[in-house]
């Protein structure tokens, strides 16, 4: 998998911030972030939405992460069609501009 620098979005106590991580493309919608390429990364294995920078799911290991993603795939597809998703994309783009 091709590695890239990706800015993930954290919302802590209602405050947005971005953190650069090394990510790999998992599929057309999602980046995979692992602790092996991000030593100080707070979450174990994670998948992030490419357009919003938001976390989709996590796992204790890569297999659990894949299993968890398979469980939420249908719901995630519905979210991508929602008005809220478009709002999250705009917010993410604004955060990147402000940095």
Locations of the language-model features?
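Negatively charged, low-complexity tracts enriched in Asp/Glu with abundant Ser/Thr
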Residues: 1-25
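Membrane-proximal basic amphipathic "stem/tether" segments
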Residues: 82-85
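Short intrinsically disordered terminal tails
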Residues: 1-3, 93-99
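Acidic, low-complexity, intrinsically disordered interaction modules
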Residues: 15, 21-79
